[in-house]
């Protein structure tokens, strides 16, 4: 074999390595490469006897975003939900984030003892958060805080009540959204409000709710609760699971696929080395 031919054969292993590395890096850079979204059914059951819940906001996302975080100040979007039952600002916020895969909301309040079902999609390894107002409170809410979605089957989580820390708990109908009186059946001359009152600003953080204290319009007998306030079941739709025909998917990092490519590159490298050695022996 001529020297030029030997040089070309010597380049084969290097080309195999470069090709494998490029493919591996491309897959690692794309977290959901080769993955299909799974459809999840989210079922929310109201476990209270006197607290209707607003239609839940449901969000599937990565670890790069928090819908809420205990111990931290609530966002203005969460404040709108917790004080006024207004989901729109939060839906707009998550809808503009690249860390969010899908979001949805219910269509009607969930009365005590009732359930609601919402569907969302997410790739493997995703998290889910939910938020819904406890209607007969100043700024109470409940929900899931960045819970890992099941790869298959179902997962059930019971959730407690949170205080958004944005409004003083006056427990006065004048400061509470109007549906409270109509739904529970305890009424007064105060119509209630769906607007934030700056005079009641608390400037606190998200924390465990102390519950209804009574003594004004809200009563422990009619509006009180004991935790948990809701049960949330997350069910992966078997018909929407990623195909099992190829190599197993990882948790969303892309590393498993990259390993397959790297192994393929190593095999190409080995083949190139064998050909090179054989060629050298032929020349001799």
Report residues per predicted region:
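C-terminal membrane-anchoring or membrane-association module
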Residues: 263-284
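Structured domain cores in non-transmembrane regions
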Residues: 35-39, 47-156
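Sec-dependent signal peptide cleavage junction
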Residues: 25-36
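Bacterial N-terminal signal peptides
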Residues: 13-26, 266
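Extracellular low-complexity, O-glycosylation-prone Ser/Thr/Pro/Gly-rich "stalks"
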Residues: 56-58, 68-70, 82, 89, ...
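Juxtamembrane/start-of-transmembrane alpha-helix segments at the extracytoplasmic/lumenal side
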Residues: 250-264
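Bacterial N-terminal signal peptides that target proteins for export
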Residues: 2-18
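C-terminal low-complexity, Ser/Thr- and acidic/Pro-rich disordered "stalk" regions positioned immediately N-terminal
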Residues: 237-254
């Amino acid at each position: 074999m001529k020297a030029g031919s030997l040089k070309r054969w010597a380049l084969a292993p290097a080309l195999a390595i470069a090709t494998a590395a490029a493919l591996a890096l491309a897959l690692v850079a794309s977290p959901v490469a080769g993955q299909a979204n799974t459809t999840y059914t989210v079922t929310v059951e109201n476990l209270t006897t006197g607290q209707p819940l607003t239609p839940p906001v449901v969000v599937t996302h990565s670890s790069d975003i928090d819908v809420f975080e205990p111990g931290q100040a609530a966002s203005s979007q969460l404040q709108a939900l917790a004080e006024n039952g207004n989901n729109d600002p939060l839906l707009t916020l998550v809808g503009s984030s690249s860390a969010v895969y899908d979001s949805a909301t219910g269509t009607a309040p969930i009365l005590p003892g009732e359930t609601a079902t919402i569907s969302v999609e997410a790739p493997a390894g995703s998290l889910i958060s939910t938020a819904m107002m406890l209607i007969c409170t100043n700024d109470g809410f409940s929900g899931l805080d960045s819970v890992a979605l099941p790869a298959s089957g179902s997962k059930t989580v019971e959730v407690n009540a949170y205080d958004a820390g944005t409004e003083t708990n006056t427990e006065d109908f004048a400061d509470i959204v109007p549906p409270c009186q109509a739904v529970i059946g305890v009424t007064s001359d105060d119509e209630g409000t769906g607007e934030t009152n700056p005079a009641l600003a608390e400037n606190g953080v998200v924390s465990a709710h102390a519950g209804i204290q009574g003594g004004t319009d809200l009563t422990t007998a009619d509006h009180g609760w004991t935790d948990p306030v809701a049960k949330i079941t997350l069910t992966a739709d078997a018909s929407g699971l990623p195909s099992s025909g190829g190599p197993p998917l990882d948790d969303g990092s892309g590393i498993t696929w990259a390993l397959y490519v790297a192994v393929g590159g190593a095999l190409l490298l080995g083949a190139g080395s064998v050909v090179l050695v054989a060629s050298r022996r032929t020349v001799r």
